[in-house]
Every structure is written in structure tokens, then in C-alpha cells.
Amino acid sequence: GGLGGRSANDIAKTTDLAIAIGTKLSDFTTGSWSNFENPNFRLICVNAARFDANKHLAQPVISDAKLGMEKISELLGNWKSNNAWIELARESYKKWNEYIDQQIAPTNQELPSYAQAIGAVYKHADPTDIAVTAAGGLVGEVLQVWRPKSLNTYETEWGFSCMGYEIAGALGIKMAKPDQEVIVFCGDGS
């Protein structure tokens, strides 16, 4: 969708099945469904909330995410996607990362772009540093540029337009994880 990477959006065009796990499938993430062009496209939604599992003509799986995926894996048995599809995904992801590397590279312009500023911070961040963002155009930039170096090190809020969340959110994260650095990106909406 609008906040996603080109690689995921490109793959979505030809995919025949997507499994949405614990997501509300908002327009931000789906591109208002314009990305799914395959006429045979099917959707499975794994969600603990019945309302969110029953969206977009999906096959709902009303379940805890982990338990639901364990059951789906069990039902799939030894089935695997074909190698051509996996290679297409890898190549697309590689191209996406090359694109991001170009966007964050220094240039001779007077002021750095959002991507360049975020990239500079990212380059110097430790693997345990936590990035937080929430409002304005900066959210999309951070989402695309920041590639978490370890689990649970990226926090964003954009689905409910809670301008200023990143400030309170960062304080709460720092209280919960005092030994980790918290990096806050304040957007133009805060």
C-alpha cells in the first residue's frame, strides 16, 4: 500500500493468496486493494477479532495468531511455494533495498531529504535502539527507510492518526525498557 515497499506492492500484483495475520487491512497497507490484480486472488485473515477476520471476502480464521498459523502450517503439510516465486520475491526485495540505499546516500544538496536524515540516524543506531514515529509524512519515510536490526525495535502509529503519539509512546517505551535507547522521529503533524 501507500506505506509499503515497492517489492511487496509489486509481488502483490500477481499473488494468488495472501495471509493477513492480526491486521485490520487498512487502505494504508493495502493500497485500497488496487495492488491485488490477479483475478484469482484469495485472502485468508487470521485475527482474534471476528470483525477484522471477516473483511474483503476473506476466508476468516478467528484465532490467536500463533495458534492459527500453527494450524494452517499443519494443514499445508509438506507443501511449499515454487522456487520461481521465492526467487522473484528475493530479487524484488534486493531491488527495493538497493533503491533505499540510493535514497539515503549523501548528495550535494543544501538540505538533506527526510530519507537521508533518517538513513544517517539509522547508520549510527545500535541494534537494540528503538525507533518511534507517528505523524505526518515522516511516518512513510521512516517505515520505508528504517530496517529494524533486531526484534521489537520499531514502533509506529498511523492507523488512528494520533498526532503526538510518538512523544508519549517513546516515554512509555523508555520506562518499560530503560536499558535501550529510544529514537523519536516527530512528524509535521505533531
Label each residue range with its predicted role.
Residues 2-89:
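Glycine-rich, acidic loop regions that bind phosphate or pyrophosphate groups
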Residues 93-179:
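Active-site diphosphate/adenylate-binding microenvironment
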